[in-house]
């Protein structure tokens, strides 16, 4: 079967709706829900797909589609394919590093008395098809921390050589724990706690946010219900 190009014959170059169809088909190929595209691609079409994936932080996922299409004879230009592959390999390496950092961070926090659950990006990897997990665009680390019911004993500054501890419970325990981490790292910073999270010291350049509320709703009634659900199910995570 001859493959026609979007740029000439099958779809109009100026038809944005049809281009969006191409982009969605391309992602379906990456996810394994489609074998090929409705139409063939010219070089300009491949460049558009690359630019689309770059804008949407889907470079790694998109390269999986490039590999699958290559296997059925729909070939991306060599120069662009090599550029795409290099970026995908960087993403794989970064994901591997973040997975290690998440494991290290969770282990340390749990040793200190906090139950943890990795949220958002790295926490969502299990929802991706296995072949795409390592190619998801990584970001920072978001970790939900839940203190023990009897609270945490946090070292506080006293102005002398003696170490004193104060017992904090609930949200205050998580906030003071994050602030203690900055003191232990020798960082002169008082992180500001907002409604649902507080910054923690970065790990080798990776930013870390400690959440004491996984998420929130802007509706007061729905938010109260959501927070109650989180509280009731926190230790199931």
Please describe what each predicted stretch is:
Residues 2-139, 145-237:
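Conserved NTP-donor binding/palm subdomain of two-metal-ion nucleotidyltransferases/polymerases, i.e.
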């Amino acid at each position: 079967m001859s493959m026609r190009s979007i740029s000439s014959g099958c779809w109009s170059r100026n038809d944005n709706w049809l281009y969006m169809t191409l982009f969605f088909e391309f992602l379906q190929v990456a996810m394994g829900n489609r074998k090929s595209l409705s139409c063939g691609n010219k070089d300009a079409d491949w460049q558009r797909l690359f630019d689309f994936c770059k804008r949407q932080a889907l470079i790694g996922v998109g390269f999986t589609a490039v590999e699958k299409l290559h296997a059925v004879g729909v070939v991306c230009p060599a120069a662009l394919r090599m550029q795409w592959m290099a970026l995908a390999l960087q993403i794989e390496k970064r994901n591997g590093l973040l997975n290690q950092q998440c494991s290290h961070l969770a282990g340390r926090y749990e040793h200190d008395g906090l139950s943890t659950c990795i949220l958002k990006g790295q926490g969502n990897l299990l929802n991706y098809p296995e072949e795409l997990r390592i190619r998801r665009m990584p970001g920072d680390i978001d970790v939900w921390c839940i203190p023990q019911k009897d609270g945490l004993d946090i070292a506080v500054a006293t102005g002398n050589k003696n170490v004193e501890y104060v017992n904090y419970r609930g949200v205050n325990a998580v906030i003071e724990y994050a602030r203690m981490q900055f003191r232990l790292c020798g960082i002169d910073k008082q992180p500001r706690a907002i409604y649902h999270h507080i910054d923690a010291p970065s790990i080798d350049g990776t930013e870390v946010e400690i959440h004491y509320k996984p998420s929130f709703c802007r509706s007061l009634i729905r938010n109260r219900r959501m927070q109650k659900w989180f509280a009731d199910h926190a230790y199931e995570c």
